[in-house]
């Protein structure tokens, strides 16, 4: 049969599968309601192709050349052109050695970038393949879950809540669907689709469940045709903007240095043309951090792979830097903070109908549950039966209403053995109570039981029933009868409390966002040690009543430990308000209605087993359950970010150091350094610095982000110091006999070739050693670097020392200085290295604002969304609050003598901030009352409460 069908036969010009009756669709596609066979599906797959959009085939060679097309590479390419075009005078041939060296350096950097990005891309593709959209398809007469890519016209598929429609299809018999087509049509509200209507690939099912027949796949779908007509736009991310800013700073620094050299060398000093060009080449070659794009890209690629090994797949690479800066995490309760393994305590079941016992309440709730594709609630209830088959024993299912976030209940219409029609429903107790229109004493009793369950951390599930005398699934039936309440217990994960404590210590405030009752949220928060300062979702409305103590909504959201009774639209509002308060927000989600909040959040996190819609909207997809995966990802992200920040400070420092140092030597002593030797320094530096992507680092104990002020200021200070150290060294070697007198080495006065050798080695050693200073938060000799970085450093400096000792290259104007001078240079470098750490501390201390507190209160270097500079004020406030409420002061995070280091200082501040977060509950009106009650031993039941309950 498959051989008799082709795309030409079913093209819209020949037949409009979107408009013709559904029965004719089956005829045109030569299929039936029994679905296709596996063999027929494979044959049609050969004819119609895979159900996915065409992927652009990227030219590998052009991609390789693309790594040479950026501002930093342009400067190096300009230097290469200068070496053979402008450096052609004074009776000397073009500088072919520098041209070849620069070209090799460019090719090496591009090759490394190309290989690493290609490997990272392949790894990401393999990981994302595991997350490829799947669909329920009827093949060989059996329903099964398959990858959406295998769908062909004629397949029968099942679409349910949370699914992304995998292909264009026509709906068969069933209840209407609510379909979100905003990604395709721009419609803001979901469209209602009935039997016979078409649904488009890429739209999202918001409500309902139905079967459909596929009419178009891949590039032939509505979405595929639209995507084929437009090219995707590449938005410039924050990371790229930072990269550009640092690159521009380095280029401007080099430009200023070259301009000063040109003005002084030619009009004032009347230097030879070729000598001047050589000096300009020194600044160009040595000052450009040509390896920066490569190092940062490789670091992120390797980091992304490590995150995936921990169970967090990054869909967007720059989400790593945002994860490092996250300071608020809004977490789901069910499945993330808890196990999502519900149990029903039969002894606590409450029965409301006179002719019903507890077993019958369980049976009714099991009938209103799915027997396949079950969620956690359905599984727990059906498993209460002796045999799960009892859920459908003796009845004929007529219609099943699946759960949806709006109605928050399921229902089944069925026929019993006597031919009578019945309907039963289970769901959120508030919805079932409203459905049954309970009043008076019955309603009061139901709420008392719900509250009693909630106080013990138990969720409630309402069960109701009705008769359907009209024997029609669409009829309203008799009034609903409230049958009973079931208690559900979802135990917290064993590691949740410890994970939340770790998050607080890392400066990440965890807020519980749950759809359960407020009392359940509070009880769970109490068990997890995350605080009970929680509010109902109604408090998110812009009205200041007694429930919030008149606190503005945005401040309430910031200070709350969580919110209960939350709907998806509330999640979006919570994220928006927190972002307005300058927080970097992470949001977890799993359902289709979580997608807006996941997109709005700085870091959208799709939890394990999330729907396709949630995964599509997220930045990070978890492959393991629980909050610990997220906290581990935060630590890893901060480590990755720390490596990138360490390198950028190093790159800026080296630019300033090369430009200022060699400019002063060239202008003060009219000494012409060899461009080729600067090229050797650059090559050895780049080879060493590549290993920083796998360096050992201590993640920041607080949320971190790009602080350009700190990067530029630290780079300028360290670079200027190293430049002055080089100038002093050159003065001592060129104009004095200091080294000869103190160390017994021969004088180098008038020996320019040997001066180039000693100057080369001095610049090489301290330039590469700088990475140990920028990579550490405390003393560089305290924080052990990675073995790979150490090996690379010593190998590079061994090569540099051998060159300085033995090299006799006339084209580079260098002659070996001997082992004596090499020993002197190493001693000088070690002595002048020590102040680098001190300068680093002074710069950070100055930028932190502590040195200026008398002039500007709490000036900080933090330029992220959140004002972390208020740490000291909050610490003082926290101490005062503890004293007021009779609490002991918090213990210090570190009790050793190394409190001088910035690491321990910042870690201590992080601990204080965590303490502040816990004390916020005491600071609120509600928290204050609870605190006084606990302190004075009052009976809270006898108090007149005027705060959120």
Curated annotation (Swiss-Prot):
GO terms for molecular function: ATP binding; ATP hydrolysis activity; metal ion binding; P-type proton-exporting transporter activity. The modification Phosphothreonine is found at residues 883, 948. It catalyses: ATP + H2O + H(+)(in) = ADP + phosphate + 2 H(+)(out). It is found in: Membrane. It holds the Pfam family E1-E2_ATPase. This is ATPase 6, plasma membrane-type. Mg(2+) binds at residues 590, 594. The chain crosses the membrane at residues 65-84, 97-117, 247-267, 277-294, 646-667, 673-695, 712-732, 754-774, 787-807, 816-836. Keywords: ATP-binding, Hydrogen ion transport, Ion transport, Magnesium, Membrane, Metal-binding, Nucleotide-binding, Phosphoprotein, Translocase, Transmembrane, Transmembrane helix, Transport. The modification Phosphoserine is found at residue 931. Residues 85-96, 268-276, 668-672, 733-753, 808-815 are extracellular. CDD domains: P-type_ATPase_H. One of its GO terms (cellular component) is plasma membrane. PROSITE patterns: ATPASE_E1_E2. It comes from Arabidopsis thaliana (Mouse-ear cress).
């Amino acid at each position: 049969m498959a051989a008799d069908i082709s795309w030409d036969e079913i093209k819209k010009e020949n037949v409009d599968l979107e408009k013709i009756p559904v029965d004719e669709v089956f005829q045109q596609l030569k299929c039936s309601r029994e679905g296709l066979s596996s063999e027929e599906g494979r044959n049609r797959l050969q004819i119609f192709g895979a159900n996915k959009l065409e992927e652009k085939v990227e030219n590998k060679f052009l991609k390789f050349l693309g790594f040479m097309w950026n501002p930093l590479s342009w400067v190096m390419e300009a230097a290469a052109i200068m070496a053979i075009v402008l450096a052609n005078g004074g009776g000397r041939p073009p500088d072919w050695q520098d041209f070849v060296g620069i070209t090799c350096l460019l090719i090496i950097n591009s090759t490394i970038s190309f290989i690493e990005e290609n490997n990272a891309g392949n790894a990401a593709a393999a990981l994302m393949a595991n997350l490829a959209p799947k669909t329920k398809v009827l093949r060989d007469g059996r329903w099964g879950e398959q990858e959406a890519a295998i769908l062909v016209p004629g397949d029968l598929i099942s679409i349910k809540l949370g699914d992304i429609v995998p292909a264009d299809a026509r709906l068969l018999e069933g209840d209407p669907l609510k379909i979100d087509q905003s990604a395709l049509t721009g419609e803001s509200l979901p469209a209602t689709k009935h039997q016979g209507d078409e649904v488009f690939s890429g739209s999202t099912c918001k409500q309902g469940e139905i079967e459909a027949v596929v009419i178009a796949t891949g590039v032939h779908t509505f979405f595929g045709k639209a995507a084929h007509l437009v090219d995707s736009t590449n938005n410039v991310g924050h990371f790229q903007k930072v990269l550009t800013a640092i690159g521009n700073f380095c280029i401007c620094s080099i430009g200023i240095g070259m301009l000063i050299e040109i003005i002084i060398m030619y009009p004032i000093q009347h230097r030879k043309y070729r000598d001047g060009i050589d000096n300009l080449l020194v600044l160009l070659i040595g000052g450009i951090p040509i390896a920066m794009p490569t190092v940062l890209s490789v670091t992120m690629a390797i980091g992304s792979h490590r995150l995936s090994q921990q169970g967090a797949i990054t869909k967007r690479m720059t989400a790593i830097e945002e994860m490092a800066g996250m300071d608020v995490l809004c977490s789901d309760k069910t499945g993330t903070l808890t196990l999502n393994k519900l149990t029903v305590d039969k002894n606590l079941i409450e029965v409301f109908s006179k002719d019903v016992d507890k077993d019958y309440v369980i049976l009714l709730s099991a009938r209103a549950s799915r027997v396949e594709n079950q969620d956690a609630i359905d599984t727990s209830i059906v498993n209460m039966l002796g045999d799960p088959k009892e859920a459908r024993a003796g009845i004929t299912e007529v219609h099943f209403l699946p759960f949806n976030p709006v109605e928050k209940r399921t229902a089944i219409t069925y026929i019993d053995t006597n031919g009578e029609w019945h309907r039963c429903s289970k769901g959120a107790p508030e919805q079932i109570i409203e459905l049954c229109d309970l009043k008076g004493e019955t309603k009061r009793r139901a709420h008392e039981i719900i509250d009693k369950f909630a106080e013990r951390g138990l969720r409630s599930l309402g069960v109701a029933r009705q008769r359907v005398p009209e024997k029609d699934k669409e009829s309203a039936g008799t009034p609903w009868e409230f049958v009973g309440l079931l208690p559900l217990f979802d135990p917290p994960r064993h590691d949740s409390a410890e994970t939340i404590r770790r998050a607080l210590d890392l400066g990440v405030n965890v807020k519980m966002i749950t759809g359960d009752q407020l009392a359940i949220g509070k009880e769970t928060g109490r068990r997890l040690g995350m605080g009970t300062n929680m509010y109902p979702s109604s408090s998110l409305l812009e009205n200041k009543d007694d429930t919030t103590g008149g606190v503005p909504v945005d401040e309430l959201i910031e200070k709350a430990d969580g919110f209960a009774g939350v709907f998806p639209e509330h999640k979006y509002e919570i994220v928006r308000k927190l972002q307005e308060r300058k927080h970097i927000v992470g949001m977890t989600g799993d359902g289709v209605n979580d997608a807006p909040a996941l997109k709005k959040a700085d870091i959208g996190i799709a939890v394990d087993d999330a729907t396709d819609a949630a995964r599509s909207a997220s930045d990070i997809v978890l492959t393991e359950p629980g909050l610990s995966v997220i906290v581990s990802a935060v630590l890893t992200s901060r480590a990755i970010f720390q490596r990138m920040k360490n390198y950028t400070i190093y790159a800026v420092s080296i630019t300033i150091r090369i430009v200022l140092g060699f400019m002063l030597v060239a202008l003060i002593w009219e000494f012409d350094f060899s461009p080729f030797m600067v090229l050797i320094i650059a090559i050895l530096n780049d080879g060493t610095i590549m290993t920083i992507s796998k360096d050992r680092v201590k993640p920041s104990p607080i949320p971190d982000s790009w602080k350009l002020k700190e990067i530029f200021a630290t780079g300028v200070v360290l670079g200027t110091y190293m430049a002055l150290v080089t100038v002093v060294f050159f003065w001592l070697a060129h104009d004095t006999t200091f080294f000869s007198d103190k160390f017994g080495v021969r004088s180098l006065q008038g020996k320019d070739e040997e001066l180039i050798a000693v100057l080369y080695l001095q610049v090489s050693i301290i330039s590469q050693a700088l990475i140990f200073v920028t990579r550490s938060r405390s003393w560089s000799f305290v924080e052990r670097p990675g073995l790979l970085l150490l090996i690379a450093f010593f190998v590079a400096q061994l090569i540099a020392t051998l060159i300085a000792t033995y090299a006799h290259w006339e084209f580079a104007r260098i002659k070996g200085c001997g082992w004596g001078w090499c020993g002197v240079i190493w001693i000088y470098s070690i002595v002048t290295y020590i102040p680098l750490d001190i300068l680093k501390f002074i710069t950070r201390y100055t930028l932190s604002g502590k040195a200026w507190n008398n002039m500007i209160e709490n000036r900080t270097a933090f330029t992220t969304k959140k004002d972390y500079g208020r740490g000291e004020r909050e610490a003082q406030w926290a101490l005062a609050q503890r004293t007021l409420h009779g609490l002991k002061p918090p213990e210090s995070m570190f009790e050793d003598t190394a409190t001088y280091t910035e690491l321990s200082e910042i870690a201590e501040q992080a601990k204080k901030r965590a303490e502040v977060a816990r004390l916020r509950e005491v600071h609120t009106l509600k928290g204050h009352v609870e605190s006084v009650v606990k302190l004075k031993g009052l009976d809270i039941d006898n108090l007149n409460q005027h705060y959120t309950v």
